[in-house]
Regions:
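Long, structured ligand/cofactor-binding scaffold of large enzymes
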Residues: 1-187
Length: 187
């Protein structure tokens, strides 16, 4: 949808066709033209930056809110293993080394009414935590940080944000850059 915007500093009057394309993608692509460490963004399964001359770091994060509201354990597990998979599939393959998460739930001690089709926030909390723990830590990828927020506004739908960090060599022994994937017929 088009958004009418007036810049408070310059007074410039403009229309924004897409907040994501205008305020996330465009500045990132503009920066990519100016720096040599931003290797791949908005293209493959995760973003890739040059860590040093020998290694690249990639990261992917996404939400799994609706699936986790319907099935807290399964929804959260598919969220974390999905971003693990995306790291493995970045470029010619990266090694997942760490997971991260942010969870927002209704208060676990909620005593108010709940619609028939909603789970109690404490059930959602326990299920999401277990799903991410089993999908990440128990598959050998440690969760190195996270956050939990409890607020009434998340009673109807939790926020389940999962991310994975991976590493990959900048170049393979044959000289190919590992973040560049060029599939051909028959692969």
């Amino acid at each position: 949808s088009k958004i009418h915007h007036i810049d408070p500093e310059t007074g410039e009057d403009s229309f924004i066709d897409s907040i994501f394309k205008t305020h996330i993608m465009k500045p990132t692509h503009d920066m990519q033209k100016e720096v040599d460490w931003l290797l791949s963004v908005f293209h493959d399964n995760s973003g890739v930056i040059a860590w040093n001359d020998d290694w690249s770091v990639c990261m992917k994060a996404e939400t799994h809110n609706s699936p986790s509201a319907l099935d807290p354990y399964g929804g959260a597990m598919t969220g974390i293993v999905g971003v693990n998979r995306d790291i493995l599939g970045t470029g010619l393959g990266a090694r997942p080394i760490a997971n991260t998460d942010v969870f927002c739930f209704g208060p676990p001690n909620w005593e108010g009414e709940l619609p028939d089709n909603l789970f109690h926030p404490s059930r959602v909390f326990r299920g999401v935590h277990a799903g991410v723990r089993v999908g990440g830590n128990e598959s050998g990828i440690p969760t190195v940080n996270g956050a939990i927020v409890f607020d009434d506004r998340y009673i109807g739908k939790p926020l389940v944000y999962c991310g994975t960090v991976g590493i990959m060599p900048r170049k393979l022994p044959d000289g190919r850059e590992s973040h560049i994937k060029t599939p051909t017929a028959g692969d």
